[in-house]
């Protein structure tokens, strides 16, 4: 048998190797060390020395070193043995011996080296609790031979790493594994090559797949009844994950599940080494932050995917994070071992959930828990990587909560009171009137339980902030040292958010990925630092790539799983993993269980279209109706269009949930499953014509959910990395929808831009087809004279529900593709500014001023503004809409050409509401009701102020509200609007430097006698704009804040929401588009339609659309030379006639923004007070199409094609 040593707190990070032993039942220690000694001995336990600050006495000296008592290292409690000689090595490499004559002996870990080569094995980790009656650690004998650099399987959390030719059964259901044995499934056979490890689940073997000659890892579960149920859960979770892209979301890829001699066998990809073995190989040295960051980013991505699926990993630790290929892909990791995973709705609190060192406080205290426990574990993991030693290495749960409490403070009283296991570790103080909890002393806990408290920490911190002072690198200087200190500050900030004791306040995976430590925005202040450059280079591994051999492997090896583990010795069933096999070939993207369903077939290697089932919508084996209807054929583009700067691209697809559930109507709270996948590198040659078939018939369900495919353009070179934020629109009829970010965030530095947008309401169309041909197109010249009546041209298309003209949209597709204007893809070349919906009231007399103050950090103005405020086809012909005479329009824009960035104002007159006699005046409003309403945004060019109220324009604008003349601004850039129903939008200037983005809006609303709310009802507005400096909203007076969410910060990437309720089903015109084209101040030629006499293009025309279009904006790609300015991207979700909106912004180095309004039916975004029957499913009957980059006007209807040689989408 092997002798046992117990490690309690080695004080340094740089020396000895430890060996590992298999634990069978009893675990009285926190860390144990066992060597293959010829003299087999058992060592019993004795009391541990208390932690003091004094020096150890002479009997505690090792190699002439005096050690503080809290640095106790190796405890040898062996009263039956008088002398134990341990060979130690000093710093110079010479050996020295020291005789331990006390059972309470300490040794300095940095000077201890177990020199025998066969003792270099892994340190034991704990997953079970301490047996209070056990005083002996049972150790299993293992042959001495160890391979230090051997491979470790990625399929299991191996707790022992001894390599043997065969393994014997432990008597608890382990399979008798023999080398070169053949394991057979129904489709494949595997030859056992090597035994890799053993755990509580069973064992792992390295095997050779005979059909494909691949090396795989097979996890052989025990056939013990206690493992049967959990094995079934693991198989079901792996089956669910098999439909996801394992490379994108960084979890181990599972190939097959089968039964072999009543043992469940799981086949996984072979991975190299787990993080714990990696640390051990490097002598538990601390890992630099530049290496911790990519690991954190990849694991957080995996956790976000699990969270979106409603899954909890529940056993995240360094052993379960595997390095894929340390040589070829440094710090590329994947998450393994879903043996403890469960669904959130089925989570049951268990004493043994999570490994103890990484166990969340809610598990220890017996509180309800969710997927937030994985974020706690991840925080402990990155702390261990940073320190080289576990942050909280508790030998028992009491020690664990004691360590946490000593460093982070006691849990809140309401948590302790609600915990079912609180009384095990805490006592109420009877001396205080208020019932406060007090942590039991180690003596009290030992007296009650018989479990001795131990000190196993290497570092004892009074607070987590003290971690920033340890292990500071000495080889950094100058800007490198400043960058390292800044990096540590952000790391500690993120760590504290991950280790928040209250799970409800703990940071989520999505916010983790948007934290500055991950996005590295704080490092942009040190552009010339080599340290910073290496940090960015290390994050390159986070760029998700799909390799050809991965695709081939998946084609040859479909996932299979068993149905009933105990019914047959070899029973297999196919998973559905066809989704990962379509990267470079024309294949049908359909689940094997839904083979008859409609498919998305992709032949072009530029884009990957993937479909998967949401956690809320399980897969259905029933065929989807309508699959035989017409399809949409998208042809690949030309050589010029396919050539892009970065060969790696990410693609979003938002698939309708009903499409995956057999188009069954549902009233459940639903969401869009979001799928992201990579494409293979682009070749400059023009590919062969391979159509993309999209069956439009599958989108004929009742709820009009849009099918959207889009790829965001990344930053170039050393510019800040961007993260695209996919989202889920959770909605149900009769309830206001919430924008919920549930899908994965694009990892850093995705390249290339591709866009495909497919409209939602296909059932409205008699026949929809995209062909590679040129259809008759309604065209308008790029330049129009000032006297030409734009409204007359527009009115030709403003009547009728369907339009016969065909709109050519090469700006969305690579070749000439035509779309019927009955289902257009609305595109706008603009920097989006969404006006406040103050016109949603049917009466313009009870409108009130809604001041909005916004400070932007962007101060470079485009030279031209293309403005279209058209409501003609997007408005409903009703009693609330009337044609405004052209001659009544005011001059909307006066922007002087000044050197400093002025305020750009677009004023839209709205005089279309009917008068009503009964008015409702809220008493909370401090402003007098006026006959005209002014909604505006003031943009300040100063990026340094923290308060948007410090804008130099705020005083003028607030004073303008109190007047009755309707003046919007006083001073430079003044715009006077002397009328009623005025809506003003200030277009923020652009600036490429970083800074704070503060959006503050104030709006006060009045309700008519029909109780139709205005733009913002007090108390119903909330907003969020996540930027590197956070979101700040100032609420002025008694008005409710309504963020306009105009964020131009380069690093902001989120899906902010602002929710308001409205009962007005009639839509209003809510769009204004401004396209920044260069870095010069705004100038308008008086010959342009913006200054045409009477401004005919501002005249609204009646339309036949009761639903407001929703805007999705994405940046168009441009070459590096064409990047004149950095534009901002906004996602504006404008519900039907309501003022509720949500916006997300991501900055891209592109000068073109495409905006696509998509109509959304009541099942997606409905108002709480409007019945679903009041909504009709109609798609936008007209579209906004951006003209070419050099165009002098902005037009909102079918135009001539843009210069497709500049922009590519496929």
Curated annotation (Swiss-Prot):
Region (Interaction with TP53): 885-1093
Oxidoreductase as UniProt keyword: no
Regions of compositional bias (Polar residues) in chain numbering: 921-940
Tissue distribution of the protein: Ubiquitously expressed with highest levels in skeletal muscle and heart. Overexpressed in breast cancer cell lines. Isoform 2 is highly expressed in testis. Expressed in both androgen-dependent and androgen-independent prostate cancer cells.
Location of region: Disordered: 835-856, 909-974, 1046-1069, 1084-1103
PTM per Swiss-Prot/TrEMBL: Autophosphorylated. Phosphorylated and activated by JNK1.
Documented effect of changing residue 1203 to R: Nuclear subcellular location. Impaired sumoylation and cytoplasmic subcellular location
Catalytic activity, reaction form: L-seryl-[protein] + ATP = O-phospho-L-seryl-[protein] + ADP + H(+); L-threonyl-[protein] + ATP = O-phospho-L-threonyl-[protein] + ADP + H(+)
GO molecular function: ATP binding; protein serine kinase activity; protein serine/threonine kinase activity; protein tyrosine kinase activity
Superkingdom in the source lineage: Eukaryota
Location of the protein in the cell: Nucleus; Cytoplasm; Nucleus speckle
Residues annotated as domain Protein kinase: 190-518
Active site: 315 (proton acceptor)
UniProt: ATP binding residues: 196-204, 219
Biased composition (Low complexity): 941-959, 1046-1056
Region (Required for localization to nuclear speckles), start-end ranges: 891-998
Impact reported for residue 219 to A: Loss of kinase activity
Listed EC numbers: 2.7.11.1
Presence of keyword Transcription: yes
Annotated phenotype, changing residue 440 to R: Nuclear subcellular location. Impaired sumoylation and cytoplasmic subcellular location
Signal peptide feature range: none
Region (SUMO interaction motifs (SIM)): 902-926
Quaternary structure, from the entry: Interacts with Nkx1-2, Nkx2-5, MYB, PARK7, DAXX and p53/TP53. Part of a cytoplasmic complex made of HIPK1, DAB2IP and MAP3K5 in response to TNF. This complex formation promotes MAP3K5-JNK activation and subsequent apoptosis.
Family designation: Belongs to the protein kinase superfamily. CMGC Ser/Thr protein kinase family. HIPK subfamily.
Record-given protein name: Homeodomain-interacting protein kinase 1
Source organism per UniProt: Homo sapiens (Human)
Gene for this chain: HIPK1
